């Protein structure tokens, strides 16, 4: 019986304890594909300095959300759910996954690291991998960096890969986001039954920011963020704005920032704000700390009520989206025998 192509989910990773915060930050800031800290020979020394200076404050933030990042546990749960629905599929002629598909997880900046997972997969007999980055919108700083590291490692093991670069406007992914938004709007009374409009609610799409230099060099990230939003607002008639969060490092970042946008909306008289973390597919420090704690407190001080839509995590609709993306990838790779 032929061995089906395995699936590898790639994600950022996050510290699994408070003690892991500083080395996680060092790994993050050491990557020139995410942020360039002077000449290349100074990257690691500057990364060490920045990670040491930021570790204390970052540890305080993680201590408020359980003492670690939940991204590892959630990503493994997503992998388990995806593996289950893939193995319910039958009929390889139609492009469905054959019985026995395995879904693994690898992280860019913390365990399980890509460089550790790949040799384990090879030892287990894996020779073909469908690679799915859990960043819906492509950027050289996220998906690009992860895939470059993966290619570097797989080259030593003879594993053939097919990488899915982005899926920012995949219909089932959009449906999952829209469902999450509809659920989130219930806090404010839901949608109008007649017009499908949210009454007195302003939606703020908040995406992870990116150094402006990447966009100037042709990175499609911002365009794909807007593409995701365009697909959403075709399904829900809502007033909305777009902002960017999680800036870090001494460079110019894409704006407007989320805190600036909240202040601007408050000045316009907006009272009810529903935040949609549009570039994230799971909970981590950006949702649980930045949005749920910092931005929520800021909004309250400005006389606003801020709520966040639930992250996709293992939402059944989202898992079905991942399944469809993977199955189409198997077809495109020519591995649907």
Model-derived segments and spans:
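Active-site-proximal alpha-helix that buttresses catalytic centers in soluble enzyme cores
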Residues: 1-337
